[in-house]
Amino acid sequence: MKKFIYLMAMVCTLGFFTACSSDDDDNDKDNFVRNEKIEGTWKVQEAGMDPTTYLPTGSVVLKWEGSDDAAITIPGFNEDKPYPIKDAISTAPLILNGMLRSVLQDVTFNEKGQISATYKEEADDNDWKVANDYATYQVVNEKMITLFLNKTKITEDIDDAQEKAMITSMLDQFKTGIPVHVSYPAANKVYFYVDKDFIAPIIATLYTQVNKIPTTGMDQEDLAQFQMLKAIVNQLPTIMEKTTKFEAGLELIK
């Protein structure tokens, strides 16, 4: 159950890169359209804070516009009082950047549409590992790619049948891939992000799925994490109704 909870938490907090392809690779490698501007190894930026603006710096980027009364109540935070979404969006990267940098070092896009990443399974691990065959991409144009994750690879080490079925069901929602926008903030930077049009259906799916999950068999730690996640997810549809613009993504550097 932990892997399922972590997967949903990642979607809820970062809202990016949670989709998959069918088991077969549909890319025609001989006719692969390249975008040389994104090829190569891109590093996750160090987490920090701008000394002038006091805003968090790093690779996690969240942008939001919407109603001033949009708020979220997070159990155990802000005395369980509603917290304005605009404030949550501006402060969340301060936490997320540190978390991301501790487990993800870099991402490589090669000229054949394959993606690999250097990562740690846990932040306190000593050794970095390389993840291959989890993801591929197709170039739409200079400002858009379609990202595919390998469902079989993602779920191959899940022993619990119920958990595996849940994750597979979630991933099956996105067989056509993720439309990922690409921009170039500087010569040595690239910004990959998804927008509200992609996030909104994910939230609707999460809302449905999370309210179907039985808590039978969860240990105390899993149950506490799940209940917090469920409380957050159940507020997201209302928040999206009050959202006019949302972007979530990664700004990587060479």
Regions found by a protein language model. Name each.
Residues 4, 13-45, 49, 248-254:
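Bacterial Sec-dependent N-terminal signal peptides
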Residues 8, 12, 92, 96, ...:
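Short, flexible helical or helix-coil boundary motifs
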